Amino acid sequence: MDHHQESNPLKEIFSLSSSPFFSTLKIKKHIFVGISLLITFLIFSVIVVDLAGFEPHLCFGFLLSPRTLTKERGNDDVCDYSYGRWVRRRRDVDETSYYGEECRFLDPGFRCLNNGRKDSGFRQWRWQPHGCDLPRFNASDFLERSRNGRIVFVGDSIGRNQWESLLCMLSQAVSNKSEIYEVNGNPISKHKGFLSMRFPEQNLTVEYHRTPFLVVVGRPPENSPVDVKMTVRVDEFNWQSKKWVGSDVLVFNTGHWWNEDKTFIAGCYFQEGGKLNKTMGVMEGFEKSLKTWKSWVLERLDSERSHVFFRSFSPVHYRNGTWNLGGLCDADTEPETDMKKMEPDPIHNNYISQAIQEMRYEHSKVKFLNITYLTEFRKDAHPSRYREPGTPEDAPQDCSHWCLPGVPDTWNEILYAQLLAMNYRTK
């Protein structure tokens, strides 16, 4: 065969280009070239750019179904568990995995039925994410994955609420629950700033460290104005933090103390670089404290060992007044169904998610435990007026914390699901 007689593809293409049809297309040649360059750029970006940071739902959301979008939002998780709806538990579901108020790790203030609440319907709901299912909590598996490890909760009393919930959930897999003990012999109480429960069979400790601001709170600088009683040092991470190094799971939270009642009205202002700053606003201080938290995590924690979570803001449901001005939450017995009554996402969450987004390349095991939306529905599940025994009848209702068993159990189910997605297991 004469190779010189073979057809020349390029010659044929240019020959075709001289036809009337392609002559018309020449008019729009600049459009064709532009589109070609754009497609080439997109393909190059997908191939070359670090795929860990590529989020297809942002670029090509119009090509994805709602179900796909729900899964994509979770990045490396199988699902975005933070969006869904509350559905009633089926009566045929095995209840043996659920604990009751007899769990000895519960603070008296969270035992709502024991404190006089008549309805128990608030315990009959489960969270159903959109587009997927939340894995069933497996206490035995969680304990085994955490063998010889430490699970640490750091934050305010809402964090203690979640910590107590997890203790009760994990203890369901322990036949002799009396073996579980507090390492210092202390009773579980809101008056204790540090509590550590040991599961001896697994050599596991589950700890709670009370640090409402996460950063240092202390005396103001010398010669401060008389109205300054204390300061929040936004650039100094809490002194207890040295105890958290080496933890396998850390769950941080803060937010409920970041308001004017707990700061300015109480004579508490902000301090940075050793200097008092009375002009710094609460949310500016909050943002700066998160930067301090971020620096500590990146500098002090082992990115291979420590699985770090920052829980989002837990909504409050005071109606007809604030907590100290007659606010109530004892009238509701079912989750909210009117979306118009739902509060917008707190600005705290924007700062938290942004801080975590900035950390993703340096510490891939830092996650945003987003529970705000699902919790906003649950106006029915607070202790309200069913507080700990001995509380005066005219005391403010508790519309911040949660009855247990209750909503924090769902937070821990999501925590467990996210750990599974991360292939969590202590080393």
From Swiss-Prot:
A motif (GDS motif) lies at residues 155-157. The keyword Ribosomal protein does not apply. GO terms for cellular component: membrane. A motif (DCXHWCLPGXXDXWN motif) lies at residues 398-412. It is a single-pass type II membrane protein. The chain crosses the membrane at residues 31-51. It comes from the Eukaryota. GO terms for molecular function: O-acetyltransferase activity. Pfam families: PC-Esterase, PMR5N. May act as a bridging protein that binds pectin and other cell wall polysaccharides. Probably involved in maintaining esterification of pectins. May be involved in the specific O-acetylation of cell wall polymers. Belongs to the PC-esterase family. TBL subfamily. PANTHER family: PROTEIN TRICHOME BIREFRINGENCE-LIKE 8, PROTEIN TRICHOME BIREFRINGENCE-LIKE 9-RELATED. Contains 2 motifs that are conserved in esterases, but it is unlikely that this protein belongs to the catalytically active pectin esterases. This is Protein trichome birefringence-like 8. It comes from Arabidopsis thaliana (Mouse-ear cress). The lineage of its organism: Eukaryota, Viridiplantae, Streptophyta, Embryophyta, Tracheophyta. The gene is TBL8.
